[in-house]
A protein has these predicted regions:
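Short gly/pro/ser/thr-enriched loop/turn and capping motifs at secondary-structure boundaries
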Residues: 102-105
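Basic, amphipathic alpha-helical segments enriched in Lys/Arg and hydrophobic/aromatic residues
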Residues: 78, 82, 107-158
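Polybasic low-complexity intrinsically disordered regions
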Residues: 1-91, 96-100, 148-149
Length: 158
């Protein structure tokens, strides 16, 4: 999943996310079923979610050969599913789209696996440094997110 955040005025890569009306950057997270971050990519907010997901999923072959199923929300349906089938056909990787139920529009319904990455974004929002992107380089932004995730994991162990 992705999250759009504003950037500070000192420069760096930025773009406009028209859907969320944010001038800044997007953070894409790949998390496991516990909500622990496996991979993070930060880029301009002008890049669509499906294209940003390709940046995240392109690393799967090298680093995460043990993954078999990836849960994504409805925003990633369509061409991304076909792209994964073409890119990694022999690995047995499956992209499962978890769609919202339109039956209960006005009620909250907990959908399986959809809330895991949202919960991770909620955990990361506790860190003031991540409320806005203060870093000049996107690589530095990724490192700050991984540091925050490390602190969260260490707090669970304690």
């Amino acid at each position: 999943d992705s999250q759009s955040v504003k950037v500070s005025n000192h420069g760096g890569v930025r773009g406009y996310d028209a859907g969320k009306k944010v001038l800044g950057r997007k953070r894409h997270l790949l998390v496991d079923t516990l909500g622990l971050i496996l991979h993070v990519v930060v880029h301009s907010a002008a890049i669509q979610d499906r294209d940003g997901a390709r940046l995240v999923l392109s690393i799967l072959q090298q680093r995460f050969g043990w993954l078999r199923c990836i849960f994504v929300d409805g925003g990633y349906a369509g061409t991304l599913v076909d792209w994964v089938k073409q890119l990694l056909p022999r690995r047995g990787l499956r992209l499962q789209v978890v769609k919202r139920s339109d039956a209960g529009k006005h009620r909250f319904k907990l959908l399986p696996r959809r809330w895991v990455v949202e919960r991770t974004f909620g955990w990361l929002s506790k860190f003031r440094r991540l409320s806005k992107d203060y870093e000049f380089r996107t690589e530095s932004s990724e490192a700050v997110i991984l540091i925050a995730a490390t602190r969260l994991m260490l707090a669970r162990l304690a």
